[in-house]
Amino acid sequence: MRILLAAAECAPMIKVGGMGDVVGSLPPSLIKLGHDVRVIIPGYGKLWSLLDVSNEPVFRSNTMGADFAVYEAKHPIHNYVIYLVGHPTFDSDQIYGGENEDWRFTFFASATAEFAWNCWKPQVLHCHDWHTGMIPVWMHQDPEISTVFTIHNLKYQGPWRWKLEKMTWCPWYMHGDHTMAAAMLYADRVNAVSPTYADEIKTHEYGESLEGLLNYISGKLRGILNGIDLDEWNPAKDPVLPAKFSIKNLENRLENKKILQREMGLEVNSKKYLLGMVSRLVDQKGVDLLLQVSRRLLAYTDSQIAVLGTGDRYLESGLWQLALDYPGRFSVFLTYDDSLSRLIYGGSDAFLMPSRFEPCGISQLLAMRYGSIPIVRRVGGLVDTVLPHDPENNHGTGFCFDRFEPIDFYTSLVRSWEAFRHKDSWELLQKRAMTQEFSWQRSALEYEVMYKDVCGIKEPSPDVAEVEKFSYGQSADPSLKKSIT
């Protein structure tokens, strides 16, 4: 099949959140299944120097009263085709925000539709989040192009209808209240980025005022879990890690831990319980919960906490104050550093994700891959990926709590601290976490099933049966799993 992915991000060149990882990593797995997969994104300023871009555009046109051109490039790692929509509105390196954000992405959606109609016509146009939300509305007129819309985060829903009417000249009934609603109404299939999140968003608590619409379209809604690139994220080969390691030589992690402690200004002591967090510092990620429990945890245990990220000023200030009050035990770097984030994954003992809501989450998958035990709230994709620790039966991959309450989070932290003191069982827990299967292989197979379904291809793919071989959270190496349980 010919499949075109349209999005605002594509890792590793342009990445802010999990959407960039999906758009960057899903195509290679689909290509291995025999499909012609390409990606179209806005031509942000820095991309023209990062990528080998064609000298001449492959397509020129006009939409929404402005000229644009589409250029062809290749993904720097996986070598599949990427199309860049060129227009001065994208010349800045700023991806989100700004006064013209609504116009920019509506223009990008319109340009993508023109390109798909008149240049490279896909069988499936796979749209991601509100930035591409108007594409299914326009493509609904074309029976030859089927649309799939992926919800990465329902909280961000795009411009409201009065703006859309002025920008697109579409009457209000063509897009409901905003572009997210428009996409869900008109897309042929809709998916969320985890099965649990697909169920949650149909409830009042997580539906962001769209639960009625989501229940109405539930027949075409499903959840497909994100994956990670196991080659890119491999602690045995990661060039950033000072000490490479695998389940066969976990003792090497201690060297990474000491270096992490030193770089973040913590007391260098491998026996201390080191908690890591790499996150946007926003309410969604439960940073306020961490602020509420940290003082008690540091007072009653010998734990250390290392935080990396940027976000809301009041949360940054709270974390900074903790670092001042607990030198050598609490450290925060208010930036994003890929090398340091990998060191946190590969050197911390446990990883914090006390999220209010979590559509899928990539960090817990990376933490497990690198032997850092996730401590998570049972919500969204965290339910689908982290199994509660059961030391009596040698089962589980992390520590979980249900309510978004300080006492629940604190209890999980203390339980994990106590478990850390039992080195043999902790090592088994690390090995179970590190051997979980969360590659893109299963995700690609599930997307393929959805693509064929939406295109009306009745005969099952010969690869569909393979889906059943990969249950979420099973060991990547069954023989190894038996040896460590």
Swiss-Prot record:
Keyword Glycosyltransferase part of the UniProt annotation: yes
UniProt GO BP: glycogen biosynthetic process
Keyword Transferase: yes
SUPFAM superfamilies: UDP-Glycosyltransferase/glycogen phosphorylase
Catalysis performed (reactions): [(1->4)-alpha-D-glucosyl](n) + ADP-alpha-D-glucose = [(1->4)-alpha-D-glucosyl](n+1) + ADP + H(+)
CDD domains reported for this sequence: GT5_Glycogen_synthase_DULL1-like
Database matches in Pfam families: Glyco_transf_5, Glycos_transf_1
Pathway(s) of this molecule: Glycan biosynthesis; glycogen biosynthesis
Binding site for ADP-alpha-D-glucose: K15
Keywords for this protein: Glycogen biosynthesis, Glycosyltransferase, Transferase
EC number in record: 2.4.1.21
InterPro entries xrefs: Glyco_trans_1 (IPR001296), GS/SS (IPR011835), Starch_synth_cat_dom (IPR013534)
Enzyme class of the recorded protein, top EC level: transferase
GO function terms (MF aspect): alpha-1,4-glucan glucosyltransferase (ADP-glucose donor) activity; alpha-1,4-glucan glucosyltransferase (UDP-glucose donor) activity
Main function: Synthesizes alpha-1,4-glucan chains using ADP-glucose.
Family note: Belongs to the glycosyltransferase 1 family. Bacterial/plant glycogen synthase subfamily.
Name listed for the protein in its UniProt record: Glycogen synthase
